[in-house]
Structures are given as C-alpha cells and as structure tokens.
Amino acid sequence: GARHWVVRPNHVRPDIQTTIHGITHTHMGTSPDFSAILEPLLQAMTGRVVLVHYNRIERDFLGRAVLDTTGDTLEFPVVDTMELESRKHPVFRPNFIQRWMGEKDSPSLRLAHARERYNIPPYRPHHALTDALATAELFLAQMADQFTPDTPVSDLWI
C-alpha cells in the first residue's frame, strides 16, 4: 500500500520545501528525524520492487539518508517509468543541419508529459502520494503499450 512520511531535513531549504512541495516550517518542526522512520520504511520495502519516475531522486535521497543515519549503503530494486519511457523515446538532440532539415528533439520524459502521451489526466504534482499514484498510472499505461503480461519484472528494473 501507499504510504509517505515527512521527515525533518538535515539541511533546510525553505524555498524548495515550501514552494515546490508545500512543506512548511510547521511540518518540518513536528516531523521526526529520518532515523525514526527507517525501520518502518525498510519493512515496507522488503520483498518489493520500488516504482519511481526518475530513480536518481529516490536512490540518491534514500542512499544519502541511510548512509548518514547508519553508515551503511542501501541497494534496492527499482522500476523507473522515466527509464521505460526513454526506451520508447530515446533522447535525441538534433544538430543545426538536422534541425534545418526538420528533425525535432525527442519528447520530454517528465512525468506530466509522459502521462499526456498516454491520455492520462493531469494531476497536481509534488506531493509524495499524488506523485506515486501518477507514476503507478503511467506504469500501467506503459505496460499495456510496450510490454506483454509475460514480461519478467527483471526486464523492467534497474
């Protein structure tokens, strides 16, 4: 099941937390340290493959937080909808001559743009649960479009 935690950051960036994510000083002041949610987080991840859009965010954040908290590293399987979308739409940036000949950049791999290509309704971004649901909807559309029910999960994770 879906779940999220707001944790107190080690380095406060009020401009990002409030503007992008809507997390206020009140939220941060009453939130636990990462160490308090590490055990339930690891339990929630055990035996599961994490679904994300742009794995570097989750892997870098969780990797850094676990390293800072425990001194250990954290490796976990991830299915990345951005990576799956890049397989269908490889990144292409045409040079001057190619542009002159009418070549276009590859489409954006951002979550909202990828969802739009599959005719999935827009959503309000930058809330953990909403982003998770939006990513799950995109994943279902990608599976129906690009893969078969027999596709092993090992072909999808990175």
Model-derived features with residue positions:
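Beta-strand segments within the central parallel beta-sheet cores of soluble alpha/beta enzyme folds
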Residues: 77-80, 154
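Acidic two-metal-ion nuclease catalytic site recognized across multiple nuclease folds
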Residues: 117, 133-158
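Acidic donor-binding loop at a coil-to-helix junction in glycosyltransferase catalytic cores
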Residues: 130
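Short, function-defining helix-loop hinge/capping sites that tune catalysis or transport
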Residues: 30, 66, 88-91, 139
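Conserved non-catalytic scaffold segment of RNase H-like nuclease domains
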Residues: 1-76, 101-122, 126
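Generic recognition of well-ordered alpha-helical segments
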Residues: 84-87, 114, 138
